[in-house]
Amino acid sequence: MALNLQDKQAIVAEVSEVAKGALSAVVADSRGVTVDKMTELRKAGREAGVYMRVVRNTLLRRVVEGTQFECLKDTFVGPTLIAYSMEHPGAAARLFKEFAKANAKFEVKAAAFEGELIPASQIDRLATLPTYEEAIARLMATMKEASAGKLVRTLAAVRDAKEAA
């Protein structure tokens, strides 16, 4: 489908606006994936706060120019599906990783986080980042564990002191 200049400008403006507020981006090739499966992926993406769009590579190069996602330029080859994580840096990576497990033809090309290119082989680094709630829960568990351990050691020291006296 041929796009006129206004359509192209509108696409670049829309995706650029999303990219400005995004925490991370993941690029994938979805050739060979059925429409039903892609619809499921898009629905899961909306629920996870992930913006997904298939965009022409030339337009994507304009979108990422001068942004933290410029490192992805070399991955824009063939049909490109780009996903921006809006709420959590690992949301798109986690979504694509799970989808790729169930769909052999879906190929994650690369990701970008804070200006760093993350190759597909290391996408787990981004996908396994804990959410804010998970990080707080881990911190609280560690703090709780530490204070309980300290209390046990203090009580043991008091007991030992009483036994020695």
Swiss-Prot record:
Tree of life domain: Bacteria
GO biological process entries: regulation of translation; translation
Gene Ontology cellular-component annotations: cytosolic large ribosomal subunit
Coiled-coil residue windows: none
Keywords assigned by UniProt, alphabetized: Repressor, Ribonucleoprotein, Ribosomal protein, RNA-binding, rRNA-binding, Translation regulation
InterPro entries membership: Ribosomal_uL10, Ribosomal_uL10-like_sf, Ribosomal_uL10_bac, Ribosomal_uL10_bac_type, Ribosomal_uL10_CS_bac
A Gene Ontology molecular function term of the record: large ribosomal subunit rRNA binding
UniProt cross-references to Pfam families, sorted A to Z: Ribosomal_L10
Keyword RNA-binding: yes
Other notes: Ribosomal protein L8 appears to be an aggregate of ribosomal proteins L7/L12 and L10.
Family affiliation: Belongs to the universal ribosomal protein uL10 family.
Subunit structure: Part of the ribosomal stalk of the 50S ribosomal subunit. The N-terminus interacts with L11 and the large rRNA to form the base of the stalk. The C-terminus forms an elongated spine to which L12 dimers bind in a sequential fashion forming a multimeric L10(L12)X complex.
Function summary: Protein L10 is also a translational repressor protein. It controls the translation of the rplJL-rpoBC operon by binding to its mRNA. Forms part of the ribosomal stalk, playing a central role in the interaction of the ribosome with GTP-bound translation factors.
Name of the protein in question: Large ribosomal subunit protein uL10
Species in which this protein is naturally found: Salmonella typhimurium (strain LT2 / SGSC1412 / ATCC 700720)
